[in-house]
Amino acid sequence: MLALIRGAGDIASGAAMRLWRCGIDVVMTDLARPTAIRRTVAFSDAIVHGETMVEGLRAVRAENAAEAKKLLREGSLPVLADPECACREELAPDALVDAILAKRNLGTKIDDAPIVVGVGPGFTAGEDCHAVVETMRGHTLGRVIYSGSALPNTNIPGLIGGFAGERVLRAPCDGIFTAVHRIGDTVEEGETIGFVEGQPMKCTISGVLRGVLDDGVPVKKGMKSGDVDPRCKPEYCTTISDKALAVGGGVVEAVLYLSAKAQGRR
């Protein structure tokens, strides 16, 4: 079985890891200049650096579908700079997972593959996909919805260590981002993490810098550009999060259940 995942940020990468460990081949696509924050646990980093490793799984940039197939045979997870997912026709996946997390559907259709799964708000099971996986922290995180939609976006990050919106760092203006600190650094409230066109982006809480944009990424004012973890555990920076694992588990359930159902086994 082959699963094609649109998006290769940390949540999408959690889904990719769980599918891969269940014996399902995975190919991922993302922007040519990815905007993932938690880059140490996002397979999108392979697009920028050629390859990356997350929890022992090696991801490698592929230039086209043929190269992606070759990398799969070699045991690596291919990642393509292909935001429109044009590789879908040649790859002909058994399942397509839209994990872009745009809070809206950017073009995924229910007939894109035999199994189509939408991650988070913006999708409706039975209309533009076969199943939706909940991404809102709380009782329903990771739950698979086979009819209807995920909870609407609140624009308020989930609580971690007692903090919600305060832990997210946002660009102070439009421009090009340049980091001062690196992922895993211990930072203090009020400390400058990076600059956009000379304007500082400062921490609002103390903790460990769990995520930050790569140097040279174009940003818009207010765009999420960093993430401080108040739990102060640097090891969390290099391991897939509880949320990504929960969402990933929901993706695995959806893919396997819908596959079994199509075969008359459920």
Where are these predicted regions, by residue range?
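Well-ordered secondary-structure scaffolds
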Residues: 1-266
